[in-house]
From Swiss-Prot:
Localization per Swiss-Prot or TrEMBL: Cytoplasm; Nucleus
Catalytic residue list: D159 (proton acceptor)
Keyword presence, Transcription: no
Locus of motif Nuclear localization signal: 68-78
Organism from which the protein derives: Mus musculus
Protein name: Serine/threonine-protein kinase Sgk2
PTM annotation (Phosphoserine): residues: S10, S334, S356
Phosphotyrosine carried by residues: Y357
Positions annotated to bind ATP: I41, G42, K43, G44, N45, Y46, G47, K48, V49, K64
UniProt biased composition (Polar residues): 15-28
Substrates-to-products reaction catalysed: L-seryl-[protein] + ATP = O-phospho-L-seryl-[protein] + ADP + H(+); L-threonyl-[protein] + ATP = O-phospho-L-threonyl-[protein] + ADP + H(+)
Family the UniProt entry places it in: Belongs to the protein kinase superfamily. AGC Ser/Thr protein kinase family.
Cellular component, GO, one term: nucleoplasm
C-alpha cells in the first residue's frame, strides 16, 4: 500500500476568531439519524468512510465521517473547506465522485458521497499485479479526463495514486479524496507546499521548488507505470533512497511495452516539469498522444465505451472489493446518534460555519 500523504500544510484561519465559513447552509436539518450506517468501507487520518442507507428512500451512499477535534487540533479546517468546495464542483463530471449532502453535529462532520463498490484500483492491482496495455489505457484516459477537468477549474489535485481511484459497478473510474487539492491556481501560476504521497511525488516537489499543474501529469505517469509494471517507477522500501531515485535515477522501462506506451511514460515522467508532457497544453497534450489513438474521447466522457473489466457486483450490499480489514470492523453507535440540535453555534461547531450542503432536488432526481 502506498504511504500516507506527507507535508499537509497548516492553513491559517480566515477570520480572527478562527471560524471558517464553508459556504451556504442549504441543508441545515440533515442529521445522522436519517441514515442506517451498515459497514466501515474505509479509514483516513480524521475519521472513517461508511456504507449508509438513507431511511427515507433506501438509497445507498458512502458517508465520510470526520472528527472535529482531530481536525481542529491539526489546524486542518481550510483543508476541509477545500475538499468540500472541490466536491461541489465535481457533481457534473462522470469520473469524479459527487457530494450529495454535507452536515455536522457538535462533534463530527459528515460528507454524504456517491457510493461506488467496484473497489480501489489499488485493490485490483494488488490482486492482479499488473494490467495489459488496453486496460491501463482505459483507466489512464478516464483519470486524465478527470484531472483535465479539475485543471480547467484551476484546481491541482496533488495526490493521484491507485488508492484514490475507485471503480464503479460497471468498471468506470471514479476519482475521490480531494483533501490535498490546491484551488485557484491559474495556468501560469505555481504553488510550493510540500505534500502528496512519497511514491508519487514529482521531482520539483521533492526539491521544494514552485510547481504547477504539471505535477499531476507526473503522478499520472507514475500510476500508469505501476499499472503496467506492478510497482511505481522509482520505488524503494527506503523512502530516502526512493526520493534519491526520483530525483536522479534515469527512468527504466522494462521490455514488452509498445513504442507508444514507452513514449508516453517518458513524456509524463520527465524530471524537468517545463519539458514534461502536459506542461504546454495541459490535458490536450495528453489527449493527443499516440498512446490514446484508439480512444474516442467523446465516447469515453459519455461512458459509451465498454470498460475492460467488470467488477461483477451483485447490488450495493456486495462488498467483495473492499478490504476485509475495514468491513469486519464494528460500526460505532455514536456515528448514527444525534443530539436534539444538529450543531451548536459555539465551540467546535463554530469553526465550521456553513458546512451543511444539499443538492437541488432536480439534481438528486436526475442521478
Amino acid at each position: 500500500m502506498a504511504s500516507s500523504p506527507v507535508g499537509v500544510p497548516s492553513p491559517q484561519p480566515s477570520r480572527a476568531n478562527g471560524n471558517i465559513n464553508l459556504g451556504p447552509s442549504a441543508n441545515p436539518n440533515a442529521r445522522p439519524t436519517d441514515f442506517d450506517f451498515l459497514k466501515v468501507i474505509g479509514k483516513g487520518n480524521y475519521g472513517k468512510v461508511l456504507l449508509a442507507k438513507r431511511k427515507s428512500d433506501g438509497a445507498f451512499y458512502a458517508v465520510k465521517v470526520l472528527q472535529k477535534k482531530s481536525i481542529l487540533k491539526n489546524k486542518e479546517q481550510n483543508h476541509i473547506m477545500a475538499e468540500r468546495n472541490v466536491l461541489l464542483k465535481n457533481v457534473r463530471h462522470p469520473f469524479l465522485v459527487g457530494l450529495r449532502y454535507s452536515f455536522q453535529t457538535p462533534e463530527k462532520l459528515y460528507f454524504v458521497l456517491d457510493y461506488v463498490n467496484g473497489g480501489e484500483l489499488f485493490f485490483h492491482l494488488q490482486r492482479e499485479r499488473r494490467f495489459l496495455e488496453p486496460r491501463a489505457r482505459f483507466y489512464t484516459a478516464e483519470v486524465a479526463s478527470a484531472i483535465g477537468y479539475l485543471h480547467s477549474l484551476n484546481i491541482i489535485y496533488r495526490d493521484l495514486k491507485p488508492e484514490n481511484i475507485l471503480l464503479d459497478c460497471q468498471g468506470h473510474v471514479v476519482l475521490t479524496d480531494f483533501g490535498l487539492c490546491k484551488e485557484c491556481v491559474e495556468p501560469e501560476e505555481t504553488t510550493s507546499t510540500f505534500c502528496g504521497t512519497p511514491e508519487y511525488l514529482a521531482p520539483e516537489v521533492l526539491r521544494k521548488e514552485p510547481y504547477d499543474r504539471a505535477v499531476d501529469w507526473w503522478c499520472l505517469g507514475a500510476v500508469l507505470y505501476e499499472m503496467l509494471h506492478g510497482l511505481p517507477p522509482f520505488f524503494n522500501t527506503d523512502v530516502a533512497q526512493m526520493y534519491e531515485n526520483i530525483l536522479h535515477q534515469p527512468l527504466q522501462i522494462p521490455g514488452g511495452r509498445t513504442v507508444a506506451a514507452c513514449d508516453l511514460l517518458q513524456g509524463l515522467l520527465h524530471k524537468d516539469q517545463r519539458q514534461r508532457l502536459g506542461s504546454k497544453e495541459d490535458f490536450l497534450d495528453i489527449k493527443n498522444h499516440m498512446f490514446f489513438s484508439p480512444i474516442n474521447w467523446d465516447d469515453l466522457y459519455h461512458k459509451r465505451l465498454t470498460p475492460p473489466f467488470n467488477p461483477n457486483v451483485e447490488g450495493p450490499a456486495d462488498l467483495k472489493h473492499f478490504d476485509p480489514e475495514f468491513t469486519q470492523e464494528a460500526v460505532s453507535k455514536s456515528i448514527g446518534c444525534t443530539p436534539d440540535t444538529v450543531a451548536s453555534s459555539s465551540g467546535a461547531s463554530s469553526a465550521f460555519l456553513g458546512f451543511s450542503y444539499a443538492q437541488d432536488d432536480d439534481d438528486i432526481l436526475d442521478s
